Amino acid sequence: MKFGKEFSSQMVPEWQQAYMDYDFLKTLLKEIITFKRRTNNAPSHGGAKTGGGLNRKLTLYRAFSGLVSTPRHKRSNSSHDVEEGVQLTGSMRSGPILVNTTASHGYETTFLMAAEEGGEYELVFFRRLDDEFNKVDKFYRKKVEEVLKEAAMLNKQMDALIAFRVKVENPDGWRWEERTVEMTRLASDIATSAAALSASTPAGAKSMKVRSQEHMEAIQEGGSSRAGLMEDDEEDEDEQNETSVVSTGAIDNETTTSRMRGARPSPIDVLGRVKINNTKETPRSTIKGVLKVSKQTDLKFSRENLMKVEESLKRAFIEFYQKLRLLKSYSFLNVLAFSKILKKYDKITSRDATKPYMKVVDSSYLGSSDEVMRLMERVEATFIKHFANANRAKAMNILRPKAKRERHRITFSTGFSAGCVFSLIVALVAIIRTRNLLEMEGQKEYMNTMFPLYSLFGFIVLHIIVYAANIYYWRRYRVNYSFIFGFKQGTELGYRQVLLVGFSIGVLALLCVLANLDMEADPKTKAYQARTEILPLILLAAMFIVLVLPFNYFYRSSRFFFLTCLFHCLAAPLYKVTLPDFFLGDQLTSQVQAIRSIEFYICYYGWGDFRHRKSTCKESDVYNTFFFIVAVIPYVSRLLQCLRRLFEEKNPEQGYNGLKYFLTIVAVCLRTAYSIQKGQVAWRVLAAVFSFIAAIFCTYWDFVHDWGLLNRTSKNRWLRDKLLVPQKKVYFIAMVLNVLLRFAWIQTVLDFNFSFMHRQTMVAIVASLEIIRRGIWNFFRLENEHLNNVGKYRAFKSVPLPFNYDEDDDKDN
């Protein structure tokens, strides 16, 4: 794989704009190549023409630069002014560039051969190279500042956690003074990092105050109640051997350490300055918030609270470690990219610019700072002791989860199950045609009873396949869907796993259909009609059991994630609304017919109609009432979620979004009323009017708010500025399909009847079209969300911390 593709694949998706623009710099190099070719092919001043048989390298590069007779080894070595951060050259022969540092513009390169023919192209290249270098260095510096501040906060959290442990497990206390050597170690690292950051900042541009770092607290490295002190001696020995690299203006570590030792409070004093930050969202806490009941923030020293605090802080450390890993990767990739692009430049121009420029890169904050590495080491040590019971292997498996490998057996199983589905569909069609089942007596009863039962599995399988297609294209266009949904790293399913689940359900459902038809045709088993009717119920019960199975089989983390989001949707607005919750709520709005099929299951089997294959459900007022209710449950859930967000965020857009779902609820109720009472003109007119209004509103919201399109001032007219799919026509096709598929409801109002198609078949087709429309919506909705994250450089999740420090005490410290 070429470096450009490898570079793009290794980027943090949300930081794409902050990386070096490698592709654009390559285009500038191509312009230099084009100019050289054009120059070398032009006739010389003496009338002689360049011979076509000359060596390409000599003709294209060396003849142009005038370096053919100047061997590289004769060039004088360039000198460095380390103090000023300037790359100096003794003469033009000693190097083609001069790199210096300015307070206002950062790094600037002077191209010393701009007067040569074609030098303006190389001058443009170095100007853009400087812009990219300054951009990358500034971004990296900013992110390191952020993690240093977060590390200081985690220090305080660990102080409180250790004091909490002492209070819970050893109320009499312990000898705090004996542990001060270990407690100051991380604080020393952070103070050194802050000093190095400050010293490496150009004059007048320092954004970090050294004094603010002097009071950073240290993570106490003492053994927890669960972990022994087996590593204490080793760490003390490492501490003596550890050296700190501090630039000019750095804080003296010993002074800082002694200052912190003197200022460090005892464990009891620490607990007196903190309160529990109860971030767990429950219906009870929501109701208390509405009633303005004060939250319980006093510390209760119980093992249950200790476990909650440890789990919360454990998640915070895991997320913090992931930030450090991404920053480390960011620094390494960009330094490597600068090296690669400069080597390409040297190869094209036969100059020697890589060495002097890379010396500047290596000596810059981007290439020389080791704050991230030191923080990673300290986080690892802390996590091993306090959250992994001194088990390094266990801790590293948590901090560095292994990437999921694509297994051949999954691919084989997916392909095999897909082939089985195709074969069973062919067999089903053949049986229906050969036995002429559509013309047999009882065909209408079968379509009114068994077809709705089995169509439920069809809706589920279709939605799963559509979701698998979404995952495939999200990965193809580098939409970070696992981060957006909040999947635990290493547990997200790929499209092959999702397809395997869908095709497996499809195989079982089709086998049940064929078994049912076969038993219907066999005179020996036809008498056991009640038993044959129960096959779909058995399959549905088996699916439910697998879904709620607590054992670690069949993708347990994904199943529990789905059940959690589903419960949050049903319990709206008692839970804080997150993107996975309202995303699943939108999926449910496209599965209204499937939800009605579940209602039919309850009626058909609960009231005993399956014994006679005769449905009396529609004759029941209770069934008809719930026929209304179940259809609007997903929309009511989304409406309540919008109201919850409107109440919390005070964002009027959520009110308009809620109005959209309210109009949809009215339209669905009117269409349902008309489907029950055919021939009522009033119901028909009202259903058509409200359905049209709701469809227009929903379509506009899809395009403008959910997809971010229809922007007239965009550089991509009527779309948006940033597009992940390079073919613009895809967006216009998607908008047209969205409109056509959304208006599929029109058949319920205009009573389209086809002699060759049963009404239940028409209902199933319309429901399937809505599922397909939802799949199209899914891709562009997450694309827009991903681009919003990219615009805000949002690559991390915010993890709430378990303790809140008093503000007054923080200011004093």
From Swiss-Prot:
GO cellular component, one term: Golgi apparatus
Keywords: Cell membrane, Membrane, Phosphate transport, Transmembrane, Transmembrane helix, Transport
Cited InterPro entries: EXS_C (IPR004342), PHO1_SPX (IPR034092), SPX_dom (IPR004331)
GO biological process: phosphate ion homeostasis; phosphate ion transport
Acidic residues composition bias: residue spans: 230-241
Record membrane topology: Multi-pass membrane protein
Tissue: Expressed in vascular cylinder of roots, leaves and filaments. Expressed in receptacle and stigma apex.
Any Pfam family the entry gives: EXS
Cytoplasmic side: 1-411, 472-496, 555-684, 751-813
Induction / repression: Not induced by Pi deficiency.
Function: May transport inorganic phosphate (Pi).
Protein family (similarity comment): Belongs to the SYG1 (TC 2.A.94) family.
PANTHER family assigned to the protein according to its UniProt record, in alphabetical order: PHOSPHATE TRANSPORTER PHO1 HOMOLOG 3, XENOTROPIC AND POLYTROPIC RETROVIRUS RECEPTOR 1-RELATED
Name of the molecule in the record: Phosphate transporter PHO1 homolog 3
Gene source species: Arabidopsis thaliana (Mouse-ear cress)
Taxonomic path: Eukaryota, Viridiplantae, Streptophyta, Embryophyta, Tracheophyta
Encoding gene, per UniProt annotation: PHO1;H3
